[in-house]
């Protein structure tokens, strides 16, 4: 009985399966918090700067209110 694939094709199929399994296990066993620590730091820094900027406004909130027009 002959195999439907050559030895080279079988080697590539096994290699692809091994790499796919490796990435699957890596995605399962890595914590998303470890990967996003830097992103969280940058988001917190942006929020802090935004709050500081809001506190430094020179104009009042009344100047920025939109008045609705009555027909």
Curated annotation (Swiss-Prot):
Its main location: membrane. One of its GO terms (cellular component) is membrane. It comes from the Eukaryota. Glycans are attached at residue 58. Residues 58-71 have a biased composition (Basic and acidic residues). The chain crosses the membrane at residues 8-28. Keywords: Glycoprotein, Membrane, Transmembrane, Transmembrane helix. Residues 48-57 have a biased composition (Basic residues). It is a single-pass membrane protein. Residues 48-71 are annotated as: Disordered. It is found in: Membrane. This is Small integral membrane protein 31.
């Amino acid at each position: 009985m002959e195999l439907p694939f050559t030895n080279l094709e079988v080697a590539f199929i096994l290699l692809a399966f091994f790499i796919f399994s490796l990435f699957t296990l890596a995605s399962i066993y890595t914590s998303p918090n470890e990967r996003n620590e830097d992103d969280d730091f940058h988001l917190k820094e942006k929020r802090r700067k935004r709050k500081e900027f809001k506190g430094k406004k020179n104009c009042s909130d009344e100047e920025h209110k939109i008045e609705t027009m009555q027909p």
